[in-house]
UniProtKB/Swiss-Prot annotation:
Domain UvrD-like helicase C-terminal span(s) in chain numbering: 524-810
One example GO MF annotation: ATP hydrolysis activity
Short name of any one Pfam family annotated for the protein: UvrD_C
Ranges for domain UvrD-like helicase ATP-binding: 39-495
Protein known as: ATP-dependent helicase/nuclease subunit A
Record's function text: The heterodimer acts as both an ATP-dependent DNA helicase and an ATP-dependent, dual-direction single-stranded exonuclease. Recognizes the chi site generating a DNA molecule suitable for the initiation of homologous recombination. The AddA nuclease domain is required for chi fragment generation; this subunit has the helicase and 3' -> 5' nuclease activities.
Catalytic activity line of the entry: Couples ATP hydrolysis with the unwinding of duplex DNA by translocating in the 3'-5' direction; ATP + H2O = ADP + phosphate + H(+)
A cellular component annotation (GO) from this entry: cytosol
Keyword Glycosyltransferase in record: no
UniProt xrefs under InterPro entries: AddA, DNA_helicase_UvrD-like_C, DNA_helicase_UvrD/REP, P-loop_NTPase, PDDEXK-like_dom_sf, PDDEXK_AddAB-type, Restrct_endonuc-II-like, UvrD-like_ATP-bd
Complex and partners: Heterodimer of AddA and AddB/RexB.
Cofactor annotation: Mg(2+)
Length: 1222
């Protein structure tokens, strides 16, 4: 129930419906099942919307309507009396939060329109008002709120900024690292530290590899819930644990034994083949068969009796025995067909070989790891101290501060837990452990609602851990009292052709070992409507492979590349779709794993006239030509004796010196000087004192004079003006901004130049000043191999989309092409010199000196890189995690398609005919084979090969060069232009006459309804005021009396470093303060200061607020006391929207605005509006805002059907607060 109080103190009660019981939910499901609605909710959706009172995990497959479920659940909570501000709703991105907020807003507006109950309308209106302040956003945004509000409890200032620019972070990191590195090199334990650095960098002078190690360890620790504890307790966990053969995990032993048994089984299958040749012509066993039988028997015996024969202590002996037993090669050949029977076992043996030697030397690396632990810990502390000093933090810092606040302050934690009715999380599969800890602290233990799909967890590079979702899934299924699992399987996005191929592929591919989830019936996609099941034969999925048997040389040689021929295949299919089926270009999307070859795709499409837009995201801003020219210009202004920058500026379009000009200038050296810079030669050339003044002709002399004069003016301006103004001066002086507008990609080039000025302005606002520091910052960014994000420009709508699979997540497209399916998965991380793991900590490759082991006496040392046991353990887990994520990437890519999916790759047709495995074992591809295959294409071909007797719902087709000729590819059909010769016969035709009549009628209608045409659909009171008010005076400008005109005066320049506070900012701050001010407490300076801390404004604005004037309003005016007396009737910052009729066009439009304050009583309403305008007579503001208050009153009357009896202006722009009744 909700209680409002009328003027007489009597309660007005809203009775809310209770939450549904399980029986009521079942009843609702039955009713929905037999309803007449065209689009019915599924039983699982209903269960997810209405189940309450416990933790809920919703496993929502692709296209299953999870956003719909979340919005409906939120609305149901509101309708049952849970205010929107009592829901914590976390989304993965800001964009997702915005879309969710808009959907909730639309639902609330719709509900208000349907509701006839007055009190319910009031309540829902309050929810609309609260929506903008509700906790709907990313975890980062919420953490910032917590730290801004309670940071003082852990010594963090509320006035901080976020370092979102990676370049700025790298510059600070480098400074901290360099200082700390010097300290460690001079400490007592320096020899161990030098050995550590050499182990990774080779020597102590080149520290780049060691620096990368430290940065990676730091970043990894930041994703944990407590970096300090992880570094102290988990960082060396595996190094301390795995020091003997007995310490090897049982799981690794099981994998080795499984590989041995699989090898025996596969070898038996091969020997049973008809063409194998078990017997000789004489009828006896062949030598090959005898040898293979021995291998089969011994491998089976060793697996069965492992504990008795070997045990963990004898593992090295087992490795030697197996190595001696099996052949060195991988294949067994039968009838010229090779079967890779021993390949997987060889890989496992390689992993375990030399274990005793490794363990012998592994203990020597432990002191090095302790030094690394100390260094990373010290780096973390020092880097944080610098950020605290700068009051600038990364997102992870803010999240850890929020966790610390909630952990260390029981009262704050409990206030949040008591406040939130439910803690809701979208995209739960992409959470990391830091975010999970924060959610746990906010929850009361039984009020979490989590939505996600582990099959779409693709953000491991952001330290997302799908096992968080997986563990919850298992826990809730095993122990229902902990929470409930709800599966949303129905897909409402894709046609059956897409659903069937997705199910066919992943039922053979995905399980707990690779993919992290068994793709069984409970995870398979089901069509959500009958329309999706209508078959279309031409929409069957296609695996189109360019036959590389006779590669024409167009394909790049690197493994990353996509060949010209592959792109041509795509272009051919798109032309066919567009010409034959009329598919618009915007319905087609190309998905790639990375953007490295986008230029090839764009170039090829341009050749065929196919419009294409990319998703952007490339970080090549500083490498764009126009930006490089400007940076060299700035470098030259900073130091003209920088020859590289000076030559670049001279050769640029701004001055256009050619090679001949530069050669003539270069010869103007001073014979007395050995080294002479180009700038000095230019100055000598101008005054004719160079070595060869005769080479400087009049034209060149004129160019030199212009350049030197311009450079001099720029250098002078750089000392006085801002960077922003300097850059625009350069643009204007040499017309460079206009010049790039005439070049290719003009819009992008101008956007880049404009962004350079803005970034320079942002740089100076962040506290850094001067051209030198700006250039130094840019150069450091380039030194660290970083760049700034490209500037986005508007893209054409009617074009094929090209984006990464990651970027496509959450989107859907009618036709999807998955390109470069032959690209090998990136396994770079598993070959690094170190691998990190959350449970095991760090594992490294140790550079051991085995001189003593070899008995070597002539050499100083014999260094061998060894994979330590922790490294091998982490490597295997990382390999499986990488393959799992790639498998989920393929799932995301395939499930974006609505109608048809294409796979594009290249392969050798002859080699692909080789059977990958001799026998199908169960429904899944064998684990060893899935680990071995390292491309999407290999997975698909293996499934097509091994499960060829099944309908896999996709076809494999090889494309030859002959299929990709210009004639075969075809051309886009463009609209046929009219033949001018045919027009002469139509001049007086009836068609032309009718057309002219229609044009005349349209012109007449346009003239009659001109006002309606130009009428906007949405307007605000301020716009209406501006439209009818003859004076255009911005807020904060003094109103000048008409009878007088102020005389011009001279004001001394203002040299304060503090930015001028805008009057509009003060007005916004006042409105925020009046909104959050607690009226239940006595209004005094302390109350106002406490409330001031909670508003979102900078310190300058807060200081500019006149708190004494606000205190005077509440204490000295009758209206201020009225606020405190009737605070239960008060509504503050209330949004509204009403329909109005334009007096000229008689057309309707929507009027929207926000009312500062109003008092709602049983039979009337009192309206209040605050104004900070400066004035001389109150009557002036009364006239100015009279119409605006009339609009507010009209909105309130329409909403509540009550008269507005009083309308007040609270004027805060004078010497004291004044109340004016309007």
């Amino acid at each position: 129930m909700l209680f409002n109080i009328n003027e007489k103190g009597e309660p007005l009660v809203i009775s809310f419906a209770p939450f549904l019981s399980p029986e009521a939910i079942k009843h609702l499901q039955e009713n929905e099942r037999y309803s007449d609605q065209s689009q019915k909710r599924t039983a699982q959706q209903i269960e997810a919307i209405y189940t309450s009172g416990q933790n809920i995990l919703v496993s929502a497959s692709a296209g299953s309507g999870k956003t719909f479920v979340m919005v409906e659940r939120i609305l149901d909570k509101i309708l049952r009396g849970v205010s929107i501000d009592r829901l914590f709703i976390s989304t993965f991105t800001v964009k997702a939060a915005t879309e969710l907020r808009e959907r909730i807003e639309n639902k609330l507006y719709s509900q208000i329109a349907q509701t006839t109950d007055f009190q319910m309308k009031v309540y829902l209106t309050e929810q609309l008002q609260s929506l903008c302040q509700a906790d709907i956003g990313t975890m980062d945004a919420f953490a910032q709120k917590v730290v801004s509000r309670y940071g003082y409890s852990i010594g963090i200032s509320s006035q901080f900024r976020i370092m979102q620019d990676k370049a700025e972070q790298d510059v600070l990191k480098q400074e901290v690292f360099s200082k700390l590195f010097s300290e460690f090199m001079n400490q007592k334990e320096a020899p161990a530290f030098r050995a550590l650095v050499k182990n990774f960098s080779g020597n102590c002078k080149d520290t780049s590899a060691f620096r990368e190690l430290v940065y990676t360890c730091y970043s990894f620790s930041q994703s944990t819930e407590n970096p300090k504890i992880w570094l102290q307790e988990n960082f060396l966990s595996a190094a301390k644990t795995y020091q003997r053969l007995e310490d090897i995990p049982d799981h690794d032993i099981e994998l080795l034994l499984l590989a041995m048994q699989d090898t025996a089984n596969q070898l038996r299958d091969v020997t049973d083949m008809e063409d194998y040749g078990q017997l000789t012509k004489a009828g006896s066993r062949s030598a090959k068969y005898t040898k293979h039988l021995t291998i089969i028997e011994k491998l089976s015996d060793w697996v069965r009796d492992f504990k008795c024969l070997y045990g963990k202590a004898g593992l090295d002996r087992l490795i030697r025995d197996v190595t001696d037993l099996i052949p060195s090669g991988n294949d067994v050949t039968v009838s010229k067909v090779k079967y890779p029977v021993f390949k997987t076992l060889h890989q496992k043996l390689k992993q375990f070989r030399h274990l005793e030697t490794i363990l012998m030397y592994q203990k020597d690396c432990f002191p090095l790891l302790e030094q690394l632990q100390d260094f990373v810990f010290a780096f973390s502390e020092a880097y944080l101290a610098v950020k605290i000093q700068e009051s600038a933090f990364e997102f992870s810092d803010i999240a850890h501060f929020a966790i610390k606040i909630l952990e260390e302050n029981t009262d704050i934690r409990q206030s949040y837990q008591q406040h939130y009715h439910e803690v809701m999380v979208d995209e739960y599969q992409d959470n990391n452990h830091m975010q999970e800890r924060l959610l746990t602290l906010l929850s009361n233990g039984h009020n979490r609602f989590m939505v996600g799909d582990i099959k779409q967890s693709i953000y491991r590079f952001r330290q997302a851990d799908p096992q968080i979702f997986n563990q919850k899934f298992r826990d809730y299924q095993k122990k229902p009292e902990q929470g409930k699992v709800i599966l949303l399987k129905e897909n409402f996005r894709s046609q059956s052709e897409v659903l069937n191929v997705s199910n066919a592929v992943f039922s053979h591919l995905m399980d707990e070992s690779v993919g992290d989830v068994l793709y069984d019936e409970q995870h398979q996609l089901i069509a959500g409507s009958h329309a999706q099941t209508v078959p279309y034969l031409d929409r069957r999925a296609q695996l189109l492979l360019y036959n590389s048997d006779k590669d024409d040389g167009n394909a790049p040689s690197d493994s990353e590349g996509i060949s010209f021929s592959e792109v041509t295949i795509v272009a051919k299919e798109i032309i066919k779709l567009h010409n034959d089926k009329g598919v618009p270009f915007e319905d087609i999307t190309l998905l790639v794993s990375s953007r490295t070859r986008n230029d090839i795709i764009s170039h090829t499409f341009n050749q065929y006239g196919i419009p294409i837009v990319t998703d952007g995201g490339q970080q090549n801003y500083l490498k764009s030509v126009e930006v490089m020219v400007m940076l060299d210009t700035l470098r030259t202004i900073n130091n003209p004796r920088n020859d590289y920058a000076l030559v670049a500026l001279l050769r640029s379009p701004m001055f256009a010196f050619d090679e001949d000009d530069l050669a003539r200038i270069a010869l103007q050296k001073d014979n007395e000087l050995d080294k002479d810079c180009l700038y000095d030669k230019m100055q000598r050339a101008v005054i004719g004192r160079g070595a060869h003044p005769e080479l400087i002709h009049d034209t060149l002399l004129g160019k030199l004079n212009v350049f030197l004069k311009t450079l001099k003016s720029w250098r002078r301006y750089a000392k006085l003006g801002s960077l922003y103004d300097l850059i625009w001066k350069i643009f204007n002086d040499r017309f460079y901004f206009d010049f790039v507008a005439s070049q290719a990609k003009a819009e992008q080039a101008q956007a880049n130049l404009y962004a350079l000025a803005l970034r320079a302005n942002q740089f100076e606002k962040s506290g850094y000043k001067g051209l030198y520091r700006f250039i130094k910052m840019i150069d450091k960014v380039l030194e660290t191999q970083n760049d700034l994000a490209d500037v986005e420009v508007a893209a054409p709508k009617q074009a094929v989309n090209l984006m990464t699979i990651h970027k496509s997540k959450g989107l859907q497209f009618p036709y999807v092409f998955i390109l470069n399916c032959d690209k090998r998965f990136s396994m770079t991380d598993i070959h690094k010199s170190f691998i990190l793991n959350r449970q095991h900590g760090i594992g490294i490759k140790y550079l051991a000196d085995i001189k003593g082991l070899l008995g070597e006496t002539t050499l100083n040392s014999v260094k061998v890189s060894m994979e330590t046991l922790p490294y091998q353990l982490n490597k295997q887990e990382l390999r499986l995690a990488t393959l799992s994520e790639q498998m989920r990437l393929l799932y995301v890519a395939m499930t974006r398609a609505e109608k048809k999916v294409y796979f594009i790759g290249k392969a050798s047709k002859s080699k692909s005919q080789e059977i990958t495995d001799p026998k199908k074992l169960g429904k899944l591809l064998p684990l060893a084979l899935r680990e071995q295959l390292l491309t999407f294409q290999d997975w698909l071909l293996a499934i097509a090969d091994i499960f060829s007797t099944e309908d896999l719902y996709f076809d494999v087709r090889f494309i030859e060069d002959s299929d990709l000729t210009q004639e075969s590819v075809g051309r886009l059909q463009t609209p046929q232009l009219l033949n001018p010769d045919d027009l002469k016969d139509n001049r007086q035709s009836e068609t032309i006459a009718r057309a002219l009549d229609m044009l005349e009628a349209v012109s007449q209608l346009n003239a009659n309804y001109e006002a309606a045409i130009h009428l906007p659909t949405v307007r605000t009171p301020s716009q209406l005021k501006a439209a009818y008010e003859p004076l255009l005076e911005p807020i904060g400008v003094d109103i000048i009396e008409k009878s007088s005109r102020s005389l011009s005066d001279f004001t001394l320049p203002h040299f304060s470093k503090k930015a001028k506070v805008e009057a509009s900012h003060i007005g916004s701050a006042l409105h925020q303060l009046m909104q959050v001010l607690p009226l239940s407490k006595p209004i005094n300076q302390q109350t106002l200061l406490d409330a001031l801390r909670g508003i979102d404004s900078n310190e300058e604005v807060k200081t500019a607020l006149d708190l004494k004037k606000i205190e005077s309003f509440f204490c000295d005016t009758s209206l201020g006391q009225f606020f405190q007396t009737y605070q239960k009737h008060l509504y503050r910052e209330a949004p509204f929207a009403i329909l109005k009729v334009d007096p000229i066009s008689q057309e309707e439009y929507v009027l929207r605005g926000i009312i500062d304050a109003y008092f709602l009583f049983d039979d009337h309403i009192v309206l209040v509006d605050y104004k900070t305008d400066k004035y001389k007579q109150p009557i002036e503001l009364k006239k100015r805002y009279q119409q605006q208050l009339e609009l507010y009153a009209e909105a309130l009357t329409q909403t509540y059907k009550l008269p507005v009896t009083k309308r007040y202006l609270v004027l805060m722009g004078g010497g004291k607060p004044e109340i004016v009744e309007v």
